[in-house]
Curated annotation (Swiss-Prot):
Quaternary organization: Homodimer.
Keywords: Aminoacyl-tRNA synthetase, ATP-binding, Cytoplasm, Ligase, Nucleotide-binding, Protein biosynthesis
Keyword hit for Glycoprotein: no
HAMAP family (alphabetical): His_tRNA_synth (MF_00127)
GO biological process: histidyl-tRNA aminoacylation
Species for this entry: Ureaplasma urealyticum serovar 10 (strain ATCC 33699 / Western)
Gene name as annotated: hisS
This protein's name: Histidine--tRNA ligase
GO terms of molecular function: ATP binding; histidine-tRNA ligase activity
Catalytically driven reaction(s): tRNA(His) + L-histidine + ATP = L-histidyl-tRNA(His) + AMP + diphosphate + H(+)
Superkingdom of this protein's organism: Bacteria
Keyword Disulfide bond found: no
Cellular component GO terms, alphabetical: cytoplasm
Length: 421
């Protein structure tokens, strides 16, 4: 018998479990590649201050869950508890936003560490897959990331989940909301746990985010962020919901959804598994938009949006699915248009080719000249270019250009929609 055992909250992967793990990793990397994402890897540990500043010192992640240690130079380091902060640090340090076409679309698959009570789908060492879209305020990407996450679950034949969304305002408006929450919760202190009573002062948003407290009527009736949104923010949220409706992505608005990290300042969303295997209520995908994180990390004043997937939870959710995970590597297509009025049609075609044709497709969300389109296509490593031009579109046609052979032809829309991997 071995004298040594693995630490609590960790697992050994081998044989079939390892095969399933690697298959899922390859599936996720391949699927997001079709949306134009490039992989990035960052160190397994960072200076602790990075996570304290990004996640917020009052967050559970920082105050309770981080693995902290000092190195031989007496500097505080932390094992990575989540993926976004390290990616943003790498992007800023290596000036990736200044040396690449924007938006910058990155994906990662990394081990993370949190000191939590182990249970189904929750380990102290776990793996997180995530994507980040950096350097754009265009809310199309809010929609695109939700559509991507939804597509991942659909392709895995996972159906036991609900999508919840909310909109978190700017730091100023959020501070007004926090003050209102503090005044409200102080009236009902006795109905809250001792921990929540402390959070009234430190960060009342954590009360809303607490899985047990959020079930209480007094918490459900707390002031909502919607009362503090500007008209512009309300219009933006309405537009995101309209895009989801147009693409038949089902969702429900949860005004108590705030996520567990302090850097969100726009759309937030969670795909919540309802599988009994995950105790009936477990977030498998979560993310949102962040307006100040890049700047706070020392970079330019750019926004970003991203999401993370808990791999161990997703593997458990897959037990309810008999879908085989396939790994396909193929040519990359790029869609462009010359007229702004064709933008919505280009978006629809992009989504159709990704979902129905299983193609690796990205889109240029701007009307630029042909020579710039070709240069950008080369930098994005696209092999084929689909162009929507007004004259051809009136005849239900598009232009297909092979960027390797430079062969160009005009095809009917029906022919394009028959292209396979």
């Amino acid at each position: 018998m071995s004298n040594y055992t693995k630490p609590r909250g960790t697992v050994d992967l081998y044989n079939e479990a390892m095969n399933e793990f690697k298959s899922l990793e390859n599936f996720l990397l391949t699927t997001t590649k079709k949306y134009g994402f490039q992989q990035i890897k960052t160190p397994i540990f960072e200076f602790a201050e990075l996570f304290m500043k990004s996640a917020g010192e009052s967050s559970d992640l920082v105050s309770k869950e981080m693995y902290l240690f000092k190195d031989k130079s007496d500097r505080w380091l932390a094992l990575r508890p989540e993926g976004t902060a390290g990616v943003i640090r790498a992007v800023v340090e290596n000036k990736l936003l200044l040396n690449n076409p924007l938006p910058l679309k990155l994906m990662y698959f990394e081990p993370c560490f949190r000191y939590e009570r182990p249970q189904a789908g929750r380990q102290r060492q776990f793996h997180q897959f995530g994507v980040e879209v950096l350097g754009t305020k265009n809310i199309y990407y809010d929609f695109e990331l939700i559509a991507l996450a939804n597509n991942i679950l659909k392709k895995l034949a996972i159906s036991d989940y609900v999508l919840e969304i909310n909109y978190i305002s700017t730091a100023h408006n959020r501070s007004l909301w926090v003050k209102s929450l503090q005044e409200y919760f102080n009236l009902y202190r006795d109905e809250l746990t001792p921990l929540s009573q402390e959070r009234i002062t430190t960060n009342p948003l954590r009360i809303l985010d607490d899985k047990l407290e959020s079930q209480k009527l007094v918490v459900q009736q707390a002031p909502k962020i919607t009362n503090f949104l500007s008209n512009e923010e309300k219009e933006e949220f309405a537009l995101i919901k309209k895009m989801l409706d147009e693409h038949d992505i089902k969702y429900r608005v949860n005004e108590g959804l705030v996520r567990g990290l302090d850097y969100y300042s726009g759309l937030v969303f969670e795909f919540i598994s309802t599988s009994p295997r995950l105790l009936g209520q477990s977030t498998i995908i979560g993310g949102g938009r962040y307006g100040q994180l890049i700047k706070q990390t020392g970079g330019p004043d750019y926004e970003g949006i991203g999401f993370g997937i808990g791999i161990e939870r997703l593997l458990i959710a897959l037990l309810d699915s008999n879908k085989q995970i396939l790994n396909n590597f193929e040519d990359k297509y790029l869609i462009a248009y010359f007229d702004k009025e064709l933008e919505n049609e280009a978006i629809k075609l992009t989504q159709s080719l990704r979902i129905n044709n299983q193609l690796n497709v990205d889109i240029i969300l701007d009307t630029i000249k042909a020579d710039k389109i070709f240069r950008l296509a080369q930098r994005l490593n696209a092999k084929k270019l689909i162009i929507l031009a007004k004259k051809e579109w009136l005849n239900k046609q598009v232009i297909l250009k092979d960027l390797l052979s430079f062969e160009q032809k005009t095809l009917n829309l029906d022919e394009i929609k028959k292209i396979k991997e």
